[in-house]
Design a protein with these regions (language model features):
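A detector for small-residue-rich transmembrane helices and their helix-helix packing motifs
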Residues: 1-170
Length: 170
């Protein structure tokens, strides 16, 4: 029995069913926050400099960062990733899908700190400025892209309609 199966037996009951609904709700909340006060979103980004200076809420709130700031793009993204994420959750199981998503989030945070450490060791520019610029790139966009990739690997013969018209094979 492999490690993931052992973990599922021990802590599988804590897995969050329909995790994509919660993620999409977080994106929508982030979009509303961005629409109401765009400057406040800078307080929610994944910025290692600010985390190391006491703003620990950023370890969680970066998940609220919308991948796009247009309403139509948000709707399309929400529909697409809900379908893809739900299909992956049904085929993998709730626990494994949770491990996939939360693992992606954890490694995004680790990657942000590694990049911050590299910039700090190189001594190029102000760390606060570098952290601010790089924090805008640490969003859940890459996690969403891995969902798309995982779906394409699981269902290579599936087609989606690009712009609701053009069929594209995975």
């Amino acid at each position: 029995m492999n490690f993931l199966n052992k973990m599922e037996r021990k802590i599988g009951k804590y897995a969050i069913p329909n995790l994509m609904i919660y993620l999409i709700a977080a994106y929508c909340i982030g979009f509303v926050i961005y629409t109401v006060n765009p400057n406040f979103m800078l307080m929610l980004t994944l910025s290692p400099y600010h985390i190391l200076h006491g703003q620990v809420w950023r370890l969680i709130t970066w998940i609220l960062m919308p991948t796009d700031t247009r309403v139509f793009s948000l709707l399309i993204m929400a529909l697409l990733y809900y379908q893809l994420g739900s299909a992956l959750e049904r085929s993998w199981g709730t626990f494994r899908f949770n491990v996939y998503i939360f693992g992606g989030m954890l490694f995004t945070v680790i990657g942000a700190f590694i990049l911050y450490g590299i910039y700090a060791a190189a001594g190029t520019g102000s760390l606060e400025t570098i952290s601010l610029i790089s924090s805008l790139t640490f969003t859940t966009n890459y996690i969403n892209l891995t969902i798309f990739l995982a779906f394409a690997v699981m269902y290579p013969e599936m087609q989606i309609l690009l712009f609701f018209i053009i069929p594209v094979k995975m």
